[in-house]
Amino acid sequence: MNAMKRGLCCVLLLCGAVFALPSQEIHARVRRGARSYQVICRDEKTQMIYQQHQSWLRPVLRSNRVEYCWCNSGRAQCHSVPVRSCSEPRCFNGGTCQQALYFSDFVCQCPEGFAGKCCEIDTRATCYEDQGISYRGTWSTAESGAECTNWNSSALAQKPYSGRRPDAIRLGLGNHNYCRNPDRDSKPWCYVFKAGKYSSEFCSTPACSEGNSDCYFGNGLAYRGTHSLTESGASCLLWNSMILIGKVYTAQNPNAQALGLGKHNYCRNPDGDAKPWCHVLKNRRLTWEYCDVPSCSTCGLRQYSQPQFRIKGGLFADIASHPWQAAIFARHRRSPGERFLCGGILISSCWILSAAHCFQERFPPHHLTVILGRTYRVVPGEEEQKFEVEKYIVHKEFDDDTYDNDIALLQLKSDSSRCAQESSVVRTVCLPPADLQLPDWTECELSGYGKHEALSPFYSERLKEAHVRLYPSSRCTSQHLLNRTVADNMLCAGDTRSGGPQANLHDACQGDSGGPLVCLNDGRMTLVGIISWGLGCGEKDVPGVYTKVTNYLDWIHDNMRP
């Protein structure tokens, strides 16, 4: 187990009358990844940051005094000032507001359990409810383990959400780096600095609903289930066992209740390890082991960002909005190097779905490469994952004339039982329940690296997304598709907007084959179709045709079995 982290804090005792001095609690930081370096002040107690020449009030510990501070060249100059009660309420959660006597700055004296400029931060919140829109806790770590950036950082000034917005307090944003969900995404998130730039990432904040589950989310910090066996099959020791005297994480820990420890032997993760664990006796020796608690599925969850650029046939997109999208490359026998072949869909750690017609050349498996987590088709992504192919399975009844049974499975090669590692840009899509029947004209999404239009000689350089609607079966017939065969294993979807010859209708196109058609179902993006074929690209009143995934669930599961 990791040793308990300990921190030391130096407190400066301020004595005597009013005079200015540099604060020992506030240090200079130089932010990275910007065009120029900027010195700022950071309060180590509150984690608040202040720009050059910015002023603020702060209470003095163990005193009724209030100080006025000013950030000057990375050092805070502070002195005591007289205050009075605020003329209007500005503090939440029972906080007491005091305003400087001679200027408008104010400070809130917060009750126990609350912090922040306006006492808006709930320091006791350990998990989030629903989507976490109302979450006001102090979790500040992203799923990748990166530390969140302060919402007031000048590096975020041009981002859509920062602590400088007029409605920042209402959204939970401010001078802190805690996870929030200001845009009603699927869960709390924050900005992190990675690979020389700031980008948004979901947080590892535990969901309150996962506490009593039979599985765990993230690393299982909030797991409160009743599993009590380790991966080796050993029984966990009671957390209050006398054998554990001297250990840090026991039922005697001062924070035992908050950590989920007590008079039981259930698996827990009190120290933020990789997953739930417990103490065990092995060969008469006290040790610890990870537990056999399964990880909860996060299929179909994503960090969706609104596309900024409209292009022919759809919209440019980021891979984080479609983290199940795969790019399949092939080495052809008669040409050097790898070439983009088709799209694919991540449905489990080691399995990719695609279209059967992509593999009509019968490539040897070692000539295929699958890339996950890539926004630009031929430009490596910062967090992409690349795999060789162990084998691929094309449906035995695939008809290369009608494209009936246009489905294939690729198994990724790995030295372990796991292949793709879940991240904000790599995640599985949910397979549909067998009885899923979505209403006609349901709006869904497709994604891929295909051409912008049918006559284009080039594939898209960047991932695209398109929004289409499911056609009723009465409109998905040969009569509507120039007498091409439309089998029961197919479904149709298209852009139903009206428009003239110049209308930019969304649709799949050459190169998108094998990619996903996903629809929202029970709060998760669910795979409904596999991009298969069509007549042209983006033709008015002409839908695209997709392999109907619900018809192949047994085939998928049978072929994925060891």
Swiss-Prot record:
GO terms for cellular component: extracellular space. It comes from the Eukaryota. Disulfide bonds join C41-C71, C69-C78, C86-C97, C91-C108, C110-C119, C127-C208, C148-C190, C179-C203, C215-C296, C236-C278, C267-C291, C299-C430, C342-C358, C350-C419, C444-C519, C476-C492, C509-C537. InterPro entries: EGF-like_dom (IPR000742), Fibronectin_type1 (IPR000083), Kringle (IPR000001), Kringle-like (IPR013806), Kringle_CS (IPR018056), Kringle_sf (IPR038178), Peptidase_S1_PA (IPR009003), Peptidase_S1_PA_chymotrypsin (IPR043504). It catalyses: Specific cleavage of Arg-|-Val bond in plasminogen to form plasmin. The record marks K464, D512 as: Important for single-chain activity. Residues 311-561 form the Peptidase S1 domain. Transmembrane segments: none annotated. Its EC number is 3.4.21.68. Converts the abundant, but inactive, zymogen plasminogen to plasmin by hydrolyzing a single Arg-Val bond in plasminogen. By controlling plasmin-mediated proteolysis, it plays an important role in tissue remodeling and degradation, in cell migration and many other physiopathological events. During oocyte activation, plays a role in cortical granule reaction in the zona reaction, which contributes to the block to polyspermy. This is Tissue-type plasminogen activator. It comes from Pongo abelii (Sumatran orangutan). The lineage of its organism: Eukaryota, Metazoa, Chordata, Craniata, Vertebrata.
